[in-house]
């Protein structure tokens, strides 16, 4: 299965090749490919802190806030979630329940658009006390 995000001078496409399991229920694609001239946008890891630096104590709220922070960072560079080619996700004390929460939020943010390639890394701790989730992104936009 292959789909493309709408672009003007380049093409960002995603694929889930035969012979690999279907990753879409977990909110990602196996491959992201950028063809043609593009400007790459690298968003640093976004955590679940609000504009005052407050971190909610629960995982789901941190995921929602981190994704909102990611949207804000991308927008500042002229990018949208659908322009993201690759995500790296860090989850403290990873469980299947936390994967479900993350997957549901990613699917809600991307809606019907194909989801990017993604690597999820379980970690014992993140930069700030109480931080449970962090997400970084690489996006491609028209040059």
What is each of the regions a protein language model found here?
Residues 1-68, 72-85, 92-143:
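N-terminal presequence-like segments and the immediate start of the first folded domain
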């Amino acid at each position: 299965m292959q789909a493309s995000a709408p672009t003007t001078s380049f093409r960002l496409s995603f694929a889930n090749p035969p012979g690999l399991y279907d990753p879409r229920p977990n909110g990602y694609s196996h491959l992201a490919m950028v063809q043609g001239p593009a400007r790459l946008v690298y968003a640093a890891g976004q955590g679940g802190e609000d504009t005052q630096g407050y971190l909610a104590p629960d995982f789901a709220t941190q995921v929602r806030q981190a994704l909102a922070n990611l949207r804000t960072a991308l927008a500042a560079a002229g990018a949208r979630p659908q322009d993201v080619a690759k995500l790296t996700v860090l989850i403290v004390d990873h469980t299947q329940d936390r994967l479900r929460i993350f997957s549901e939020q990613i699917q809600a943010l991307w809606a019907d658009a194909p989801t990017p390639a993604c690597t999820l890394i379980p970690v014992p701790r993140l930069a700030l006390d109480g931080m449970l989730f962090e997400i970084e992104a690489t996006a491609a936009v028209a040059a």
